[in-house]
Amino acid sequence: MLRGLTTVNFFADDLSAAQAWYTELLGVEPYFVREIEGVPAYIEFRIGDYQHELGFIDRRFAPPGQSAGGTMTYWAVDDVQAAFDRLVSLGATVHQEVREQGPGFVTASVVDPFGNVLGVMYNQHYLDMLGGSGE
């Protein structure tokens, strides 16, 4: 039934600002931009080892009652502290400090300037699966 993660979508009130912030963070431009009446409505980046999709939707299209939080998504990083420090230096606020969750699992999370919770994680299991392609 569930074949795998396809796209992680966040909402933002100011999609142009979100595009600029995430372009700076990720070091790449979005590969896809959809505009409605000349205003960005959706942007999407491809990131990571498998080119996963990270999309941003103008909050005017959010379902009723949509707010920050909810599902926690963690992105694999090699150095959680360095990633956390960079996110904070770019203007994100601390959601959870760097924390060891067990052997081979270190996490941290921030709230981006657009109200989305963004987690980063060092996960040895992910690396083990990646090494063997995990497929």
Residue ranges and their predicted role:
Residues 1, 4-13, 33, 43-48, 63-135:
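Vicinal oxygen chelate
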Residues 1-19, 71-73, 123-135:
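N-terminal beta-strand motif that seeds the catalytic metal site of vicinal oxygen chelate
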Residues 2, 9-52:
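Core segments of cupin and vicinal oxygen chelate
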Residues 29, 43, 51-66, 116-135:
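Membrane-topology and secretion signals of cell-surface/extracellular proteins
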Residues 36-37, 79, 101:
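Short beta->alpha connector loops
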Residues 46, 57, 74, 97, ...:
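A cross-family glycoside hydrolase active-site/sugar-binding cleft signature
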